[in-house]
Design a protein with these regions (language model features):
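Conserved N-terminal helical subregion
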Residues: 2-12, 29, 54-190
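Conserved hydrophobic helix-helix packing surfaces used for dimerization/oligomerization
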Residues: 12-14, 35
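Glycine-rich NAD(P) Rossmann-fold beta1-alpha1 loop
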Residues: 18
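N-terminal Rossmann-fold NAD(P) dinucleotide-binding loop
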Residues: 21-22
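Glycine-rich FAD pyrophosphate-binding loop
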Residues: 29-49
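Active-site substrate-recognition segment that forms the wall
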Residues: 199-200
Length: 200
């Protein structure tokens, strides 16, 4: 890839406007890196359910200057309990005891996190209803063809387009998904059911 003197890619394409794509777009813009984003959806809409931001995620978001915006509308977690299918407790963590050293963990709706990230990347050019149909690595650049027929040359192409990534398939060929053995159920419940901010 061809890089400018400061070592940062000169022109970056981010494919996918989810959590990772928007976080990266905002971060690159703040560093003065020219980037643009394409998103398959025709328009932004609330997607997903509840999400937990652990202390590691909050540390990363704090480095991006976004922690305060998230904390104002989220539920701090005081404890977390893990149980098996028979309701037997496997583990319990008192998160409140860890906050002085590691910071807070938050529970919030995924769309609330997405909105904060979208606001942080508001100055990045975004092309909605657009996908990538071909990628060609030319050594010193990457040639990209888009679903609307447009073409572009980029120093770096980043696939942040999710589980069924078109970028991954174009770059590495089709690889079937492999079940990890884990299943996660997510839901949204009324705030009064959380036991005063508890996670268990």
């Amino acid at each position: 890839m061809t890089n400018p003197p400061n070592g940062c890619p000169g022109k970056v394409l981010i494919v996918g406007g989810g959590i990772a794509g928007l976080a990266l777009a905002g971060a690159l813009h703040r560093q003065g890196v020219a980037c643009q984003l394409v998103e398959r959806a025709e328009a932004w809409a609330p997607v997903g359910a509840g999400i937990i931001l652990g202390v590691n995620a909050m540390a990363a978001l704090r480095n991006l200057g976004l922690a305060e915006a998230l904390e104002s509308g989220a539920q701090p977690l005081e404890k977390m309990t893990i149980k098996d299918a028979d309701n037997r407790r496997l583990a319990r963590t008192n998160l409140a005891d860890l906050q002085p050293r590691f910071g807070v963990s938050l529970a919030l709706h995924r769309s609330d996190l997405h909105d904060v990230l979208l606001q942080s990347a508001r100055h990045v050019p975004m092309h909605m209803g657009t996908t990538v149909t071909s990628i060609e690595d030319r050594g010193d650049s990457v040639a990209v063809t888009f679903s609307d027929g447009d073409k572009g040359l980029f120093d770096l192409v980043i696939g942040a387009d999710g589980l069924h990534s078109q970028v991954r398939e174009l770059a590495f060929g089709h690889r079937p998904l492999r079940y990890s053995g884990y299943t996660c159920w997510r839901m949204v419940v009324g705030g009064g059911l959380g036991g005063g901010g508890s996670g268990g």
